[in-house]
Amino acid sequence: MKNNPLDFQRATACHVLNAFRNGQRRVLVADEAGLGKTTVASEVVRQVKGLDGVLDDNIYCIVYVCCNLQIAQQNIDTLSDEGETVDLAQSRLSMQHYVYHRMKTDLLKNQKDTLVLSLTPATSFQMTFGTGSADERALIYACLTLLCEFKDGNRMTALSEMLQRDAYKGWIGVRDRYVGYVQEPDMDDYRMVIKKAMLSHLSSTYKNGKTIKDELMRLTSSEEMENRSNAGYYLIIALRKMFANISLEVLKPDLVIMDEFQKFSSLITTELNSSKDTEENMVARKFFTNRDTFILLLSATPYKPYTTIEELNENKDDEQYKDFHRLLNFLYENSEAAPDIKIIWQNYSSALPHLGNTDFGELVLKHQAAEDMLYHVMGRTERQNTGIIKEVMPDISHCLTEGDIRSYIQMQHLIDHCRSYGQSVFTAPTDYTKSAAFQLSFMENYKLKEEIQNGWKAGAKRKSKVDCLLLDKNIIENYSLSQYNNARLNFVIEDIFGDKKHPTHVEQLLWIPPSHPYYTTGESIFTRNKDFSKYLVFSSWGMVPKMLASLISYESERRLYKRAYHGATYSDDVKRLLRDDNKTKGESIFNTVSTYLSSLYEPKATYGISLAEIRESIKEKIEKRLSDMEAERTNRVSSVDIMLLMQALDNGTDTTGKIYTDAANVLADIAIASPASCLYRAFRQISKENSDLVKSLAEDAAKELVGIFNNRYGIAAVKLTCKTKDDYFLRVLEYCALGNLQATLDEFVHMIGENKPLTQVNKRIKESLVSAYPQPVGTLQGFSEDDKIRMRKHFAVDFGNTKQTEQAVTHATSVRSAFNSPFRPFLLASTSIGQEGLDFHWYCRKMIHWNLPSNPQNLEQREGRINRYKCLSVRRNIAKAFSEKFAWDEMFDEASQVLKQDYPEMVPFWFLPLDNELFRDRNDIEFIERIIPIYPMSEENERYQRLIGILSLYRLTMGQPRQEELLQLLKGKVTKEQMKELLFNLSPYSRNTK
């Protein structure tokens, strides 16, 4: 569902459309990370329909090309009208002929005209080797058997056997499912199109003068059974390419959107006339040679923005300079202005190094000509970061232990011993030791580990002490691990959980405290941690995210279980406690909506008063109802009796089972804070019409939400937080009330988007409630055989660098959904690779740079993951400044009126003018924190200062060769005022409001 674009986004969309109208077919939107390029694209999608020739075939086709399926899953909903999702199983290029017709048929049936298809290079364009997915081959089978030649039973069987390949399980089911898809009654047009296309392409030459059809007929004959497997391998590759070409013939995109396209820049550098059947060539020939197709490129970093001297010397290549000019050539290709761009840019580039020796006014004119030339084909809006990001460079010297040194020494000694047993291993980077605790336990796909394992088996084991390199599973089992031998990890654990004298006890939190609580409570785990934020950690090393996810989750468990369960062990099976003696599920109280009880609590009417007052008011109303009921009173509370009472109150009956003497208090807490009640009220804000649907979906989501109280860490957290009651379900109610669950869910629903259908909101909430993930971890006991234990990841998880399989993408999507929710995980660790375009900002304002990036733009890209629309720090500061307002929309509306002034509508959604009197004297302002845990006396401190210095100047050298040398040359020659004039202003909003 589309978000309404803000003023600066509308200006960019308008600029793109004007360029299209003026004959420019390729336009780049290079807005800084996090400023909503997808929202700009959605506005272009909406308006480009009006351009001449777009709707000639009654279907408006958009092809969305992005770098991975996680981004596709995130953004396709914004681009489409129907809240579409990406089906990984059908994402291959060779399947798009079917996907297009299926979607087209459904659209026309529903009188719609906009079709959005998603292609991702990691899945859609992999055809140069391999036989593809089972779904891909099943569709090939379903299509080929439409032809008369393959309707013979024996030949169909042979074709099926050839296409089955390694799909030993479930092949028949997948095959028959696609046969059913293709044979659906409303797909007549598709069958006609695909049969005609196949007859044409099957006559193409395969090899040795034979056609694809000849080879197919040969291999599906009874005589070729023995050769079918080997020869069939190469034929399937040919068939995949054939159907990919058919897909490209079928697709007639009016608009191609290439998102984060720097990740597959080969698409814009490929030779369009090349006869090579690579995926890039096929797509490029189709999309880029079609003069009728509009192409919109989206990327915050469309080319490498900066090349350091080290990179220049190491690679012998000025990558930034080449990237920049390659991009310009692509954007201006076939344009009449193309010959002029080199001259304009050369004039500017020649003058810039001589800044101090030439007339500044003349340089400004050349700069303006270059800027106008760029603006013709692109737009770039940048955020104002002043006052948003707070730099935190903690002193971690007190976190250093003897174990840090021993880790390094043990690794070097182990390597020496392995070398004595014939392994070609000499040293390990010092940064391995500084970055990862128990590094050998978490290394995967490291050549170093492979060599060490070989040496270990050969005899190095007998000579080596490795207690700092490998986890001991016995220590893990007994929750005895407390020395991690890594200063960075010790710092993060202390930052999250506190030290011995001042523990935070955040391990007891099951969700982030709401930014805008509806009522006051006494001191609790939530009030003490009201400014707690999730953490996003970026590292250069693949082992670090796994290490952090496993060990920080372990540490949270260790702290919980040591206090909650005497003698607990890691492998203990914690009972499901939400059950009473009669084995009736106590959770039914929490996932059943009582419309009567839900109506008794009106958050807006009681906003700002205490929980005790609200509870007392509701209790009085309930007591009046209970006094009229005929039932035995009892001092024993039972979830069964409470459930019967809820039903009686809803049905208006005067009889029920037993009534607990304190039932009114219990029912008041259910009214205020049970998951079902809170979800019901949250959903009623979205849909006030269909109360049955609202109730059904609220109960559906509540069933998932109750799960957080019904696992190892949830049970321990509730037990430690709520100690005054004996029955677990009463403790859960108290926990929900203390945690302002209603305010928490309302804030979450606001972030999901109240303009979305209720079914999508319900789905998104359920996606955010994930279970613990297992992580295989090497141990001292199992290192020889690579026998690993499984550690749970829940408080912290790792993300990214997964294969683009259906299972891996589903897992990554659920992790991202969970992190962008108030619920666990509270820390997400990743490498920088592949995370461009993804957002993690809903509940995170703390970014830890575990290792410094080599390039200033990478620093910005990382922080762009949390410096985004309505990020956590913005919401919390808005809630503090406009606390008299109740609803989030009301607060943001008021903030817009008071704070926007001459700013673009980045205020108040991206940043707040903290010099405004509303914020100036406050001491509780929250910032995005850039946390850099640097070892004392480390060269990283100097590297960081250099990065920050370059960060403020590198834009001045855009598109120039040898940038770092140019910066040195300009140092001291450019005043701040001159620098402002020489920075390129490519922002449509800024240029229009000058």
PLM regions and their residue ranges:
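Helicase-associated low-complexity regulatory tails and linkers flanking the ATPase motor
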Residues: 1-24, 39-828, 832-994
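ATP-binding Walker
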Residues: 35
